[in-house]
Amino acid sequence: MAALGITVALLVWMATLLFISIWKHIYSSWKLPPGPFPLPIIGNLLQLDIKNIPKSFTRLAERYGPVFTLYLGSQRAVVVHGYKPVKEVLLDYKNEFSGRGENPGFQMHKNNGIIFNNGSTWRDTRRFSLTTLRDLGMGKQGNEQRIQREAHFLLEVLRKTQGQPFDPTFVVGFAPYNVISDILFHKRFDYKDQTSLRLMSLFNENFYLLSSPWIQLYNNFPDYLQYLPGSHRKLLKNVSEVKSYALERVKDHQKSLEPSCPRGFLDTMLIEMAKERHSVDPMYTLENIAVTVADLLFAGTETTSTTLRYGLLILMKYPEVEEKLHEEIDRVIGPSRIPAVKDRLDMPYLDAVVHEIQRFIDLLPSNLLHEATQDTVFRGYVIPKGTVVIPTLDSVLHDRQEFPEPEKFKPEHFLNENGKFKYSDHFKAFSAGKRVCVGEGLARMELFLLLAAILQHFNLKSLVDPKDIDLSPIAIGFGKIPPRYKLCLIPRSKV
């Protein structure tokens, strides 16, 4: 019996050595960047803190260098860390690394839309979306007027709080939601509209779930975990509900479409779909249009909403910054004129604060996953087609050489010695290259105008002592999620 046990142990030992030998051969068959040795099935899971994966990337970069290989389960990934290599990936190799790595939580969006899509469908849909959004006012006066109009409605709702504590999540968030809704549907909604509040709740919950430890695990092992109970089921259900809403809106617009008078982005896509009605391989299908609308609605609402909400919390933490903003707003805009984009040139401090909020919160620390579209030689390494590429934005936004004391909130990071706004090429909050955020211009405009409007009319009042405000995110994964809080808005006396 003892001999049998020894024999079994030897067989297991030999099988393990053989498996490791084969694994090493596969691992070293390409000139991959260095990295920790992966274990079967789980890959490098043990080297990652699933509660703070970006921090794990920083630690591994210190050991293996700015470009290193990891296995997320069985998925090979190359992590790129630091300003120069990240810029090279996003700009110098923008075609080679323009693919989108898979996100299991959005599998039903695969091959459609503009966020989680790949290939020719993505390129054509993105190109059309950029052109149409630009024509509808993306970055032009049309969007400025949209935001100014929405700021008026937002201020009305904020005045009704009458200085009492309230949660700003869906109040402040309704402004960017209405701006993108007007672009997509040529329609804005009342701040009490239940369908809109439901959608915003889904966006908010999804952003949190995508950043939770369980979803980090699920993304790496979807084939094993999909049958188990867990928050991935809630995420998938939410994504399905948002997509169903978008499809319903598409069908409603299709019924009432007037090709000679398109009402917005959605109508323009439907007109293109009609042109393809005899095509054997149409691009503008109901599915693709619905997912594109869902992508734009989610991205156009949640990222700006979260940034504004985080920004207000930061300003309550640093009342001296808020005081300087009030002084600049009073001097340049005054108490009653609507803030305008042209004011940015005369308001370097607010411009710097808006940039510093985005840099400091580092909303998408690891960017969205990229993917190699072909075998690529990068910095002497061979990165095979299909490899996930992770250009870490936090390593650029928190570069100590560019931003002294990057862990601190300092608007001076974007001001020169004369107090003028100082642009930094390290500011990559919207990513860059082929996968840069399509709404970057709109988001920049919204953040500046909405923050200016709020501070023009209100003082921010925290329910706790400013020094006790904790700015730490409650979850770090896909994004950094700010803590929930309440605040009071005290009307400012007219000057």
From Swiss-Prot:
<keyword id="KW-0443">Lipid metabolism</keyword>
<keyword id="KW-0349">Heme</keyword>
<dbReference type="GO" id="GO:0051879">
    <property type="term" value="F:Hsp90 protein binding"/>
</dbReference>
<keyword id="KW-0492">Microsome</keyword>
<dbReference type="GO" id="GO:0006805">
    <property type="term" value="P:xenobiotic metabolic process"/>
</dbReference>
<dbReference type="GO" id="GO:0008392">
    <property type="term" value="F:arachidonate epoxygenase activity"/>
</dbReference>
<dbReference type="GO" id="GO:0005789">
    <property type="term" value="C:endoplasmic reticulum membrane"/>
</dbReference>
<dbReference type="GO" id="GO:0005506">
    <property type="term" value="F:iron ion binding"/>
</dbReference>
<dbReference type="Pfam" id="PF00067">
    <property type="entry name" value="p450"/>
</dbReference>
<dbReference type="InterPro" id="IPR036396">
    <property type="entry name" value="Cyt_P450_sf"/>
</dbReference>
<keyword id="KW-0479">Metal-binding</keyword>
<keyword id="KW-0999">Mitochondrion inner membrane</keyword>
<keyword id="KW-0472">Membrane</keyword>
<comment type="similarity">
    <text>Belongs to the cytochrome P450 family.</text>
</comment>
<keyword id="KW-0496">Mitochondrion</keyword>
<keyword id="KW-0560">Oxidoreductase</keyword>
<keyword id="KW-0521">NADP</keyword>
<comment type="subunit">
    <text>Interacts with chaperones HSP70 and HSP90; this interaction is required for initial targeting to mitochondria.</text>
</comment>
<keyword id="KW-0256">Endoplasmic reticulum</keyword>
<comment type="function">
    <text>A cytochrome P450 monooxygenase involved in the metabolism of fatty acids. Mechanistically, uses molecular oxygen inserting one oxygen atom into a substrate, and reducing the second into a water molecule, with two electrons provided by NADPH via cytochrome P450 reductase (NADPH--hemoprotein reductase). Catalyzes the hydroxylation of carbon-hydrogen bonds. Hydroxylates fatty acids specifically at the omega-1 position displaying the highest catalytic activity for saturated fatty acids. May be involved in the oxidative metabolism of xenobiotics.</text>
</comment>
<dbReference type="GO" id="GO:0019373">
    <property type="term" value="P:epoxygenase P450 pathway"/>
</dbReference>
<protein>
    <recommendedName>
        <fullName>Cytochrome P450 2E1</fullName>
        <ecNumber>1.14.14.1</ecNumber>
        <ecNumber>1.14.13.n7</ecNumber>
    </recommendedName>
</protein>
<dbReference type="InterPro" id="IPR050182">
    <property type="entry name" value="Cytochrome_P450_fam2"/>
</dbReference>
<dbReference type="GO" id="GO:0030544">
    <property type="term" value="F:Hsp70 protein binding"/>
</dbReference>
<keyword id="KW-0503">Monooxygenase</keyword>
<feature type="binding site" description="axial binding residue">
    <location>
        <position position="437"/>
    </location>
    <ligand>
        <name>heme</name>
    </ligand>
</feature>
<dbReference type="InterPro" id="IPR002401">
    <property type="entry name" value="Cyt_P450_E_grp-I"/>
</dbReference>
<dbReference type="GO" id="GO:0005737">
    <property type="term" value="C:cytoplasm"/>
</dbReference>
<dbReference type="InterPro" id="IPR017972">
    <property type="entry name" value="Cyt_P450_CS"/>
</dbReference>
<dbReference type="GO" id="GO:0020037">
    <property type="term" value="F:heme binding"/>
</dbReference>
<dbReference type="GO" id="GO:0043231">
    <property type="term" value="C:intracellular membrane-bounded organelle"/>
</dbReference>
<dbReference type="InterPro" id="IPR008070">
    <property type="entry name" value="Cyt_P450_E_grp-I_CYP2E-like"/>
</dbReference>
<dbReference type="GO" id="GO:0016712">
    <property type="term" value="F:oxidoreductase activity, acting on paired donors, with incorporation or reduction of molecular oxygen, reduced flavin or flavoprotein as one donor, and incorporation of one atom of oxygen"/>
</dbReference>
<dbReference type="GO" id="GO:0005743">
    <property type="term" value="C:mitochondrial inner membrane"/>
</dbReference>
<comment type="pathway">
    <text>Lipid metabolism; fatty acid metabolism.</text>
</comment>
<dbReference type="InterPro" id="IPR001128">
    <property type="entry name" value="Cyt_P450"/>
</dbReference>
<feature type="binding site">
    <location>
        <begin position="298"/>
        <end position="303"/>
    </location>
    <ligand>
        <name>substrate</name>
    </ligand>
</feature>
<keyword id="KW-0276">Fatty acid metabolism</keyword>
<keyword id="KW-0408">Iron</keyword>
